[in-house]
């Protein structure tokens, strides 16, 4: 469960290391975001020679949360950290590699590219 001011790790090779959620997209009163939701993020920490610089604002999709996600069979999938993948304005991933596992809930038409790049789908 991600809200404004939440810090997330970046799970791709764009050069950003840490981002902060500055807005949960999808309605004016929406407070929380989970796996598969799109948020606005500000880059807080970035690699020196990366594609992305500190202070820039991007869209991102959440791929891992410590809160987890409940499946229809009753199982709960949760992770150690919160992580996101940086997106451009067309909601396509900027990076060419994804690090760490992603969940099966991302298998929609919007995020199939992320699922295909991920090393493991849980």
Curated annotation (Swiss-Prot):
InterPro entries the record matches: Ribosomal_uL14, Ribosomal_uL14_bac-type, Ribosomal_uL14_CS, Ribosomal_uL14_sf
PROSITE patterns documented for this protein: RIBOSOMAL_L14
Domain of life according to the entry: Bacteria
This protein's record includes keyword rRNA-binding: yes
GO CC terms, sorted: cytosolic large ribosomal subunit
GO annotation, biological process: translation
Gene Ontology MF terms: large ribosomal subunit rRNA binding; structural constituent of ribosome
Pfam families in UniProt: Ribosomal_L14 (PF00238)
Keywords: Ribonucleoprotein, Ribosomal protein, RNA-binding, rRNA-binding
Subunit structure: Part of the 50S ribosomal subunit. Forms a cluster with proteins L3 and L19. In the 70S ribosome, L14 and L19 interact and together make contacts with the 16S rRNA in bridges B5 and B8.
Family as reported in the entry's similarity comment: Belongs to the universal ribosomal protein uL14 family.
Protein purpose: Binds to 23S rRNA. Forms part of two intersubunit bridges in the 70S ribosome.
Protein name as it appears in the record: Large ribosomal subunit protein uL14
Natural source organism: Nitrosomonas europaea (strain ATCC 19718 / CIP 103999 / KCTC 2705 / NBRC 14298)
Gene responsible for this protein: rplN
């Amino acid at each position: 469960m991600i809200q404004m001011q939440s810090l997330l790790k970046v799970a791709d090779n764009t050069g950003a290391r840490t981002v902060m959620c500055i807005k949960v997209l999808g309605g004016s009163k929406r407070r929380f975001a989970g796996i598969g939701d799109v948020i606005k993020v500000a880059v807080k920490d970035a690699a020196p020679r990366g594609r992305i610089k500190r202070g820039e604002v991007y869209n991102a999709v959440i791929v891992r949360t410590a809160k987890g996600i409940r499946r229809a069979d009753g199982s709960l999938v949760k992770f150690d950290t919160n992580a996101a993948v940086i997106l451009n304005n067309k909601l396509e991933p900027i990076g060419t590699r994804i690090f760490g596992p992603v969940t099966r809930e991302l298998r929609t038409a919007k995020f199939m590219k992320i699922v295909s790049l991920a090393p493991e789908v849980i």
